């Protein structure tokens, strides 16, 4: 066994090493946005990590045992904008702890048991806009050192131990403050002196939340001549009398929005009546909301006598036993009744009302006509209402309506095509039960409608003119309905401005090839949750703006006729997930198309085979099908490839010979311009010019020669000139053989073409002139030329008087063969397939 001394000698250095390793190196922070946002929550850090980039802007250090923040704790993060230090067990914050964070806009200190807060704790935060100090053991605003934070807009000190509502003098420096949350503190009384700073330096945009404070007294005049944007008092009063007294203490307050009431399941009041709100007559209120009063209110109209002139009135979760009527005496422009309990649908006669929100209410299932001549916005959703007849101007008492939401209601019988409601722009019927939708053109009058939702309305489309009149419609949602014979006909012919169309869950199996032809502006099309068995791309060829096409959750096995070329080029996202792909050889081209289009397909990795059974559940991308083809097909295919290859090689090799053949066929009976086409090396051009041309063209009879330096057409390929200007327009060919000729590729090329020319035209002749002795070893390299010179008569140039005489006599005789000559000129005989020419 290891001795105790040796064990200690091993453990002590190991423990020393481990103590030096920082925990932040063991548990790295999560990089949410590279170099910008890092989440270091619950990593057991006891100090600020220094292994993050200087460019970090958003840092979450919540739930780490930091306990103490010293000066310049965040010196390494000069670009920081959002810092979350929630529940870090921080007890002490020293002077300059946030120094250097000049860009920080949000600081969250929630849930820290702060015991020592230095006067300069928040120094350096020159851009701070939001400070959250919830549950920080704060006992007073007086000692909270934030008076220098002139950019502060939101201060949240809820759930603390603050007992006095007195706003310190430094609030006069917080000129940008818009929201002060003092909810869930210990404030019981408000005195005039508490709000002195608001008299001296009014904060006109300030929203003040005093909810969940045990209020029992507000000194009359405390809020006199004070202007607030919003005041919230919920769950503040334990009795009706206290509530009445405190509301009277608000006399003289001018507030844009006042919120009174309680929270769900947290009510303190035992009863509530109209006297509670009598003090509101002494306030100037623009918008009023009363929330969560679970009491049966008998005379609701009398309850709000002091609120007749507010512009917006809202009741949320209030139980109302009876309502006489909302009459013309109220000057409200916006009325909101949400989640309330009514005995019956209220009678509404409000001349100035522009917006009515009546949603999620209970009781009064039958809709009764209203008289709202100025109404522009009407939300009657989620009430279970039934409409015996809909919809026209007489139902709502207005011709100004632009927004109508009747979703999540009961049976709605369509008996009118919106006469008098031609200004409608938004119409929502989703999850209501529509009757008589396919009996006539319901929407014929709605030429200004932009948004229409008839999803899950039990509509069965059997009339092609159902959407006639909707010429301005941009969004159409009709999911969860059905079509006659599960076939989509041409019902969108007038919807030329449509950009969004939802046809999901409509049990569709087929669609007309021209169903979408008029939708050139369509960008999003949802065809998911239907019963299509193949992907037919033809109907989408006219959708030039389409970007998103969803065909998920159908029964697609393959593409129709394996044709996929009709998808518009604008398409960016195609969803084919959760379909019944057939992974067989028969559909191999479609499966390969899926692999090729993986950039276009959404969640392509989720596309799996459904058949055959041995490949069920296998991702299409990982599929590798080996298809056995018929041996005959393989043989024919291979033979075809070989034949095509051989033909291509022969055409390539004998291209110019074929060109010559084509020329002979074309010019076969034409007239020759030249007596001979001269083939020679450019090195022998002096002899050709001084001897050959001079003696033949200036002699008697004269002969016309074709020479490349003189007679070839500029700008035409050399090979084309040789064939068209040389061979096709000449009776004979003169070949000037020399060592230079043998070594020239162009000369050999011309000679080979000349052989083909002689073969094709039986009247043609080749005259060989050996200009100088040629080495036999060099001549043997050109086998055909060597063989011809060995078997045929040729002319040999001799530079002597007798040799010249014999040379020119023999050459003229060869050229005269087949030539008609008279003193007036020279005329060729033309192509003659019966004549033969020889030397």
Curated annotation (Swiss-Prot):
Transmembrane domains' residue ranges: 632-652
Membrane topology: Single-pass type I membrane protein
Pfam families the UniProt entry points to: LRR_4, LRR_6, LRR_8, TIR
UniProt domain TIR: residue ranges: 672-815
SMART domains: LRR_SD22 (SM00365), LRR_TYP (SM00369), LRRCT (SM00082), TIR (SM00255)
Segments on the Cytoplasmic side according to the record's topology features: 653-839
Compartment(s): Cell membrane; Early endosome; Cell projection, Ruffle
Entry annotated with the keyword ATP-binding: no
Disulfide bonds: 29-40, 281-306, 390-391, 583-609, 585-627
Assembly and binders: Belongs to the lipopolysaccharide (LPS) receptor, a multi-protein complex containing at least CD14, LY96 and TLR4. Binding to bacterial LPS leads to homodimerization. Interacts with LY96 via the extracellular domain. Interacts with MYD88 and TIRAP via their respective TIR domains. Interacts with NOX4. Interacts with CNPY3 and HSP90B1; this interaction is required for proper folding in the endoplasmic reticulum. Interacts with MAP3K21; this interaction leads to negative regulation of TLR4 signaling.
Residues in the signal sequence: 1-23
Description of its domains: The TIR domain mediates interaction with NOX4.
The keyword Cell membrane belongs to this UniProt entry's keyword annotation: yes
Native organism taxonomy: Eukaryota, Metazoa, Chordata, Craniata, Vertebrata
Parts of the chain on the Extracellular side: 24-631
Family assignment from sequence similarity: Belongs to the Toll-like receptor family.
Gene3D superfamilies from the UniProt entry: Ribonuclease Inhibitor, Toll/interleukin-1 receptor homology (TIR) domain
Protein name (record): Toll-like receptor 4
């Amino acid at each position: 066994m290891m001795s105790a001394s040796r064990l200690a000698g091993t453990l002590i250095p190991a423990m020393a090493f481990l103590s030096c390793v920082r925990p932040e190196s063991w548990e790295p922070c999560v990089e949410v946005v590279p170099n910008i946002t890092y989440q270091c929550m619950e990593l057991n850090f006891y100090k600020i990590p220094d292994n993050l980039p200087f460019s970090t802007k958003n840092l979450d250090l919540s739930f780490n045992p930091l306990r103490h923040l010293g000066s310049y704790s965040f010196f390494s993060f000069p670009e920081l904008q959002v810092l979350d230090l929630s529940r870090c067990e921080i007890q002490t914050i020293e002077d300059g702890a946030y120094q250097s964070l000049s860009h920080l806009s949000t600081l969250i200190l929630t849930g820290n048991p702060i015991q020592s807060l230095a006067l300069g704790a928040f120094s350096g935060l020159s851009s701070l806009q939001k400070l959250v100090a919830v549950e920080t053991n704060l006992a007073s605003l007086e000692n909270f050192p934030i008076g220098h934070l002139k950019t502060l807009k939101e201060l949240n000190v809820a759930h603390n131990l603050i007992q006095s509502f007195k706003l310190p003098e430094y609030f006069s420096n917080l000129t940008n403050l818009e929201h002060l949350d003092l909810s869930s503190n210990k404030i019981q009384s408000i005195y005039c002196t508490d709000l002195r700073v608001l008299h001296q330096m009014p904060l006109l945009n300030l929203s003040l939340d005093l909810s969940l404070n045990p209020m029992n007294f507000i000194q009359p005049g405390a809020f006199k001549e004070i202007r607030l944007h919003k005041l919230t008092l919920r769950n503040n009063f334990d009795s009706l009398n206290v509530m009445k007294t405190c509301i009277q203490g608000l006399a003289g307050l001018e507030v844009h929005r006042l919120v009174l009431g309680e929270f769900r399941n947290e009510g303190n009041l035992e009863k509530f009546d109209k006297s509670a709100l009598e003090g509101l007559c002494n306030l100037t209120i623009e918008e009023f909301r009363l929330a969560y009063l679970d009491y049966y209110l008998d005379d609701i109209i009398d309850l709000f006598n002091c609120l007749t002139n507010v512009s917006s009135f809202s009741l949320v979760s209030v139980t109302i036993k009876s309502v006489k009527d909302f009459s013309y005496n109220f000057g409200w422009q916006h009325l909101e009744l949400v989640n309330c309990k009514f005995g019956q649908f209220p009678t509404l006669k409000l001349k100035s009302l522009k917006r009515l929100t009546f949603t999620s209410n209970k009781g009064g299932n039958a809709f009764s006509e209203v008289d709202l001549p100025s109404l522009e916005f009407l939300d009657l959703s989620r009430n279970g209402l039934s409409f015996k007849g809909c919809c026209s101007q007489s139902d709502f008492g207005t011709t100004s309506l632009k927004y109508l939401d009747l979703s999540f209601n009961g049976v709605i019988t369509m008996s009118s095509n919106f006469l008098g409601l031609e200004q409608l722009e938004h119409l929502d019927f989703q999850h209501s039960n529509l009757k008589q939708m396919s009996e006539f053109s319901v929407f014929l009058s709605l030429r200004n409608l932009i948004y229409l939702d008839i999803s899950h309305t039990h509509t069965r489309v059997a009339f092609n003119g159902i959407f006639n009149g909707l010429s301005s419609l941009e969004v159409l949602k009709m999911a969860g309905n059905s079509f006659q014979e599960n076939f989509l006909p041409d019902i969108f012919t007038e919807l030329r401005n449509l950009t969004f169309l939802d046809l999901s869950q409509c049990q569709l199996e087929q669609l007309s090839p021209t169903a979408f032809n008029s939708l050139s502006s369509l960008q999003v099309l949802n065809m998911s949750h239907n019963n299509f068995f193949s992907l037919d791309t033809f109907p989408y060829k006219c959708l030039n703006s389409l970007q998103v096409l969803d065909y998920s959750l159908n029964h697609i096995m393959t593409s129709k006729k394996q044709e996929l070329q009709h998808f518009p080029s604008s398409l960016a996202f195609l969803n084919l997930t959760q379909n019944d792909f057939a992974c067989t050889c028969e559909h191999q081209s479609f499966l390969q198309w899926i692999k090729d289009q993986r950039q276009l397909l959404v969640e392509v990795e989720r596309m799996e085979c459904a058949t055959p059974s041995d490949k069920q559940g296998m991702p299409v991308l990982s599929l590798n099908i080996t298809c056995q083809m018929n041996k005959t097909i393989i043989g024919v295919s291979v033979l075809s490839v070989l034949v095509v290859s051989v033909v291509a090689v022969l055409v390539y090799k004998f291209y110019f010979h074929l060109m010559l053949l084509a020329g002979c066929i074309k010019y076969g009976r034409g007239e020759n311009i030249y007596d001979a086409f001269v083939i020679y090396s450019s090195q022998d051009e002096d002899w050709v010019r001084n001897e050959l041309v001079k003696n033949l063209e200036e002699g008697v009879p004269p002969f016309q020669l074709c020479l490349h330096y003189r007679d070839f057409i500029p700008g035409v390929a050399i090979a084309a000139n040789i064939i068209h200007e040389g061979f096709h327009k000449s009776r004979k060919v003169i070949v000037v053989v020399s060592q230079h000729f043998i070594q020239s590729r162009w000369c050999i090329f011309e000679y080979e073409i000349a052989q083909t020319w002689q073969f094709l035209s039986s009247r043609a002749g080749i005259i060989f002139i050996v200009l100088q002795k040629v080495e036999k070893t060099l001549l043997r390299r050109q086998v055909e030329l060597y063989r011809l010179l060995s078997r045929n008569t040729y002319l040999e140039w001799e530079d002597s008087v007798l040799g010249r005489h014999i040379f020119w006599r023999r050459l003229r005789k060869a050229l005269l063969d087949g030539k008609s000559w008279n003193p007036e000129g020279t005329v060729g005989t033309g192509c003659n397939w019966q004549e033969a020419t020889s030397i």
